[in-house]
Amino acid sequence: GFKVERWRAYDETGMVFGYPSEVEVDVTVSDGKLILIEVSSHVRASDVLQFRRKAELYEKMTGRKPDRLIIVTPYIDEKALEAARQLGVEAYTKV
């Protein structure tokens, strides 16, 4: 089995958005693998980069490196798909 929980933290240095702000991401552990998940109605390349930065912040603050980064969306731009490939983010569009 697995459990999904929302992780929230305050990004004091502005690592994710470029200014200090609240950051949240969905986290699940399945078969001992740590997975970060972002669900969005429409994903652009900038969203993929932002999600990658959330993962880096998560690792920095918790000391736990995610095994997988997953974006789930009904619509993703072509440039976002390319960004996901280059940044090691899995994109699921037909779930």
Model features per residue range: what roles?
Residues 2-31:
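Active-site metal-binding core of divalent-cation-utilizing nuclease and nuclease-like domains
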Residues 23, 65, 87:
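Residue-level signal for beta-strand positions within conserved beta-sheet cores that form or flank
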Residues 25-47, 51-56:
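Conserved catalytic cores of phosphodiester-cleaving nucleases, focusing on short active-site segments
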Residues 66-70:
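Short active-site oxyanion
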Residues 71-95:
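Domain-level recognition of nuclease-like catalytic cores that cleave nucleotide substrates
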